[in-house]
């Protein structure tokens, strides 16, 4: 019964479909006759492929446009032309669906011949070595072959060295240089955030109790300081448990308790140099011991001292003489060159990377001298009535500030000279106040920073001879300044140390101490500042106590912003006085500087 009903339903359904198709065909014929009454035979023929679908199928099959119908005389010709315009049999040539055609075209685009070029691996590495890390990442997404080349360890090792990370490492030290570069970039980002947020550790270096601070310098985290007691002390701020030694002098054994003041101190990676008020110069080798390896004596007070940061070369200025000292082939120190100048020297610097013969720059009043070890003193700049107020040198240029005096007042300027051509390249500034400090050695390329007594810090663009940025920094004038690729650190006469983000023209933070900031130096992760008093005389209300009060002796601060390198298990790095030293027995230091671990 069920099978009979199913067959009957199928028969009725097919009849309905046939009737509906016949009805639709009849309606189309009637509509065609009404539209074109002159050609009633066209609808009778019923061309099945006269629409756009037939045209599209013909194009896909490779055929051109169907030919236009030609008028014929008889019914035979009409039947022949109708059969010629009809589409081919579906069983003979099955047309490809549009979706399959699209997929086939996309598959043809996958294999680009440019990516399949077979190059030697070494040649591909030489081509890819000129790309930065962003471009290498884009190349790694092109194909599997390019990904292997873009992730080669040699490329990432070179890229890591080019960006200044791990400069002393070798290729065999690590196995994945791409990961090492990512870690270095993450640390750099953390360091920059710590600088901006003032997040890190601050250390006040141990003082000499019965002396006043005279001069401070540092090199790569190693700090040297000289005091009115004649003591010279060295700290290594890279380690918290380092005990700062005193550098002994030969005069201490001869006349104990009668030490002259320390006028200047300088330090590099291997040497420490100190100049005293009585004209004595001591040179220590930091790798051998605490006693000087060379002693030189001038007839008068030493007015300027310079030490090369790369080589063991020392230059001193006393009275009207400038002396250059460096060791010979056997290691014995001697006077290599001696120059005579017309006026007392105010500033003295040694030019870095000068080759075999050292070169120094000295300013004496309104004279600027170029001193070469194999030549006599030559005048680099001279304008009567315009004395030099500051000096700094780089490998190829020298910058110094001049004070404009006389009948024609042109404003105070900074002059930049080429050491090779010995001529003036730029005249910068034109300020009302005196330029007190300038830094071209540590500045980024084509930039220079200066400080002025008019309370402003200026960033100069050496390419356009214009002031790129001017910051109102310190109320009593700027005394020290340094910049890098994004920040400026300045110190003032009022004892304020300020950190600026000069790209945003914004002050990040500042710290204050009692005495003027005479020295500051920073690198990527640390900052050294020194507040040196004006007065070098001991003052204490208690005559029985010869210890100088803390507010008169000066301060040295060391800031460390790479907190991941700090050992917080050590005692609080605010003060490094051990328990057996009673330097502050006359006043309470226990609350401010605890010794116990926290």
Swiss-Prot record:
Residue spans of the WD repeats: 201-250, 259-299, 300-340, 341-383, 384-429, 430-475, 476-513, 514-561
Posttranslational mods: Phosphorylation at Ser-86 by mTORC2 promotes FBXW8 stabilization, allowing its translocation to the cytosol in response to insulin.
UniProt keyword list: Acetylation, Cytoplasm, Golgi apparatus, Phosphoprotein, Repeat, Ubl conjugation pathway, WD repeat
A GO CC term attached to the entry: 3M complex
Database matches in InterPro entries: F-box-like_dom_sf, F-box_dom, WD40/YVTN_repeat-like_dom_sf, WD40_repeat_dom_sf, WD40_rpt, WDR55_POC1
Localization of this protein: Cytoplasm, Perinuclear region; Golgi apparatus; Cytoplasm, Cytosol
A molecular function GO annotation: ubiquitin protein ligase activity
Location of region: Disordered: 20-97
Main localization of the protein described in the UniProt heading: cytoplasm
Location of N-acetylmethionine modifications: 1
Modified residues (Phosphoserine): 84, 86
Residue ranges with Low complexity bias: 51-65
Tissue expression pattern: Widely expressed. Expressed at higher level in skeletal muscle, cartilage and lung.
Domain F-box: 113-159
Ranges annotated as biased composition (Basic and acidic residues): 29-44, 73-93
Effects seen without this gene: Reduced embryo size and neonatal lethality. Embryos and placentas are smaller and only a third of the expected number of mice survived birth. Mice that survive remain smaller throughout postnatal development.
Keyword DNA damage appears in the UniProt entry: no
Pathway named in the protein's UniProt entry: Protein modification; protein ubiquitination
Effect annotated for changing residue 86 to A: Abolished phosphorylation by mTORC2, leading to increased protein turnover
Subunit structure: Component of the Cul7-RING(FBXW8) complex consisting of CUL7, RBX1, SKP1 and FBXW8; within the complex interacts with CUL7 and SKP1. Interacts with GLMN isoform 1. Interacts with OBSL1, CUL1, CUL2, CCT6B, PFDN5, CCT2, CCT3, CCT6A, CCT7, VBP1, CCDC8, ARF1, TRIP13, PDCD5 and GORASP1. Interacts with MAP4K1/HPK1 (when autophosphorylated). Associated component of the 3M complex. Interacts with POUF51 (when phosphorylated on 'Ser-347').
The protein's role, per its UniProt record: Substrate-recognition component of the Cul7-RING(FBXW8) ubiquitin ligase complex, which mediates the ubiquitination and subsequent proteasomal degradation of target proteins. The Cul7-RING(FBXW8) complex mediates ubiquitination and consequent degradation of GORASP1, acting as a component of the ubiquitin ligase pathway that regulates Golgi morphogenesis and dendrite patterning in brain. Mediates ubiquitination and degradation of IRS1 in a mTOR-dependent manner: the Cul7-RING(FBXW8) complex recognizes and binds IRS1 previously phosphorylated by S6 kinase (RPS6KB1 or RPS6KB2).
PANTHER family tied to this protein: POC1 CENTRIOLAR PROTEIN HOMOLOG, WD REPEAT-CONTAINING PROTEIN 55
Protein name: F-box/WD repeat-containing protein 8
